[in-house]
């Protein structure tokens, strides 16, 4: 797929971090980008910077995603590219111990369900609704290509740490979704690929002490640093351009394998 002004894209979680970098990179090639996010202030600013559209969106809601797609398609046309970056990563142990009483209690189901709802259900919600639109487009080439969907899993899908049961389960499911989704959508010429990022310097790291950031960076074999959001965005661009990449999960992690804790 060539990236230019004839192509429309949506990026969830596009107001910051990996999503913002992806939106900016696609827009730099002329792609018409719509950002789906809950952060209205940041999303509006980024959209203004790139000449795109911001749509306040709850990815866990069918109606919210449908409304956002309607707005984006009204302005830019039906998207050929959908990138799912929206996600949350709270840590919580399965069994919690009260420090004062020593009483043991299980992790509440609501907190587990919320992570799965945003990271997995939200990803599928956008994937399915976007694919339904892409499927009706005219093919771009002799292969019959109509579009590409890039989902964001995590190295936690394979190397989940203590306190990451919900997060790792949700991202493991996103990874597992990749191949069957690619096979399912192949009849429409829609590719599906997942990226498994390692430790990236996103806004959530801004509040972390510099010494701890250095410790995290030292755990990465090479290059011995945190990933940069634009490196994720560069891979998204490569996936969009390379029509043979389909049904694959790609680790982007500097060869790190996460320790148990």
Question: For each predicted feature, which ranges?
Answer:
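Short, small/polar-rich loop/turn modules that mediate ligand/substrate recognition or access, typified
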Residues: 186-191, 245-248
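Conserved mid-core segment of classical short-chain dehydrogenase/reductases
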Residues: 89-113, 132, 136-142, 163-166, ...
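C-terminal substrate-recognition "lid" of short-chain dehydrogenase/reductases
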Residues: 228-252, 257
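Canonical Rossmann dinucleotide-binding motif of NAD(H)/NADP(H)-dependent dehydrogenases/reductases
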Residues: 2-33
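Alpha-helical segment proximal to the catalytic Tyr-Lys
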Residues: 132, 182-184
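Active-site helix of classical SDR
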Residues: 127, 170
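Residue(s) in the substrate-gating loop at a strand-loop-helix junction
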Residues: 154
